[in-house]
Curated annotation (Swiss-Prot):
Binding positions (ATP): 169-176
Reactions that this protein is recorded to catalyse: ATP + H2O + 4 H(+)(in) = ADP + phosphate + 5 H(+)(out)
A Gene Ontology molecular function term of the record: proton-transporting ATP synthase activity, rotational mechanism
Family: Belongs to the ATPase alpha/beta chains family.
Keywords assigned: ATP synthesis, ATP-binding, Cell membrane, CF(1), Hydrogen ion transport, Ion transport, Membrane, Nucleotide-binding, Translocase, Transport
Subcellular location field: Cell membrane
Presence of the UniProt keyword Translocase in the record: yes
UniProt topology in membrane: Peripheral membrane protein
This protein's encoding gene: atpA
Segments of this protein annotated with the region Disordered: 115-136
EC number from the UniProt entry: 7.1.2.2
Name of the featured protein: ATP synthase subunit alpha
Amino acid sequence: MSIRAEEISALIKQQIENYQSEIEVSDVGTVIQVGDGIARAHGLDNVMAGELVEFANGVMGLAQNLEENNVGIIILGPYTEIREGDEVRRTGRIMQVPVGEELIGRVVNPLGQPVDGLGPIHTTKTRPIESPAPGVMDRKSVHEPLQTGIKAIDALVPIGRGQRELIIGDRQTGKTAVALDTILNQKDEDMICIYVAIGQKESTVRNVVETLRKHGALEYTIVVTASASQPAPLLYLAPYAGVSMGEEFMYNGKHVLVVYDDLSKQAAAYRELSLLLRRPPGREAYPGDVFYLHSRLLERAAKLSDAKGGGSLTALPFIETQAGDVSAYIPTNVISITDGQIFLQSDLFFSGVRPAIDAGTSVSRVGGSAQIKAMSKVSGTLRLDLASYRELEAFAQFGSDLDKATQAKLNRGARTVEVLKQGLHKPLRVEKQVMILYALTRGFLDDIPVADITRFEEEFYAWLDSNAADLLEEIRTTKKLADDDKFAAAINGFKKVFVASE
């Protein structure tokens, strides 16, 4: 049988044309050192900063330090199985988290994996955890109120949708309670809330979730938790995961509230990672870019322009101070980034003034333009009343001979402090806040004994619901003060039936 050269060459040509290369080109490096949640790898010359890499056992890592001879990687998972000499490969992707409606009502970790035992989350949408903040032209001035339901905040330091308002105070001063009450008050406000717990005890997070569930707030809330037992990389990533989940809603024209509880622990986790990566330490051993850590997170909160859908993302970051020292490094950084701060004083808290908001040092730089007209009219003199009361209170302890004007200021101040007190998880609708503050600032409470103010308030709200519902509805819909005569008639009508205690 003769074999013709033409046939052979034709067959070879055909084989070459039909040949499909199955070679996969990937950048592979070798682990040269591992420990404390950090790995160093050699050979990943083309890896990008912030890129995901995959270890041989399937655990992912984040390339952070790009050095001359090696790459510093933070490991996002258990690192005990990773050994020196193991293979590590580039993925070509940056870290993303699952987003979308499916996460609402769930408790997830910073990687978007459910930790509440309610099964998998079926969403196909993801967003990168690091994304640029909206530009100047994509934004709009803050002008819509975010009602917290807390009289002291809505009257003195109002918050608008799209604002960043810092909540700062020592441990055990009621910071989490302020945020929870704010979330509970969003029930019928068409808001999606995201509570990010950073470095909290798991029992604390459990209590928060149960509180939200009990009050029906979990149906519009996502809880992101990186508890104290988690490795530092997850604590560092948790706030970025939370804001990415919120951005998905904001860019679709919805309103979002994100609570970061608290950023001090995130900064400590980032300091730990930076020192392990051998980055040079600065003040208080924090790395040089710790300001950027928080600024790039909080700048992603915005009120979007109408062209971008008009959505908003409001941020409530927490900072824990040591012995009330707001001039430490992290507190001053975050104060300078945010649009105001609510300062919680431990002295006030332990003296029974709760929420323990210090009206003198708390400010809201942009919330005033978002406050409803009715509230700005009734709360105009509150800050001055409180400030003069605190000043005179110190003098009044030394002498009893006070003139009538001073005594009147002290009496009004004592009643103001009582009215601004509020029970735990009892947020108040804004129309009822306006009614009680009107009664306070216009002198209707001056003849009510201080000890009876709390009872007066509770009975007044119940009386308004049954006897002056139209007045409450008018404030709610017009957002303006009704006729003075209507207010006076309602308040005097209740005072006639109110019985002071002996």
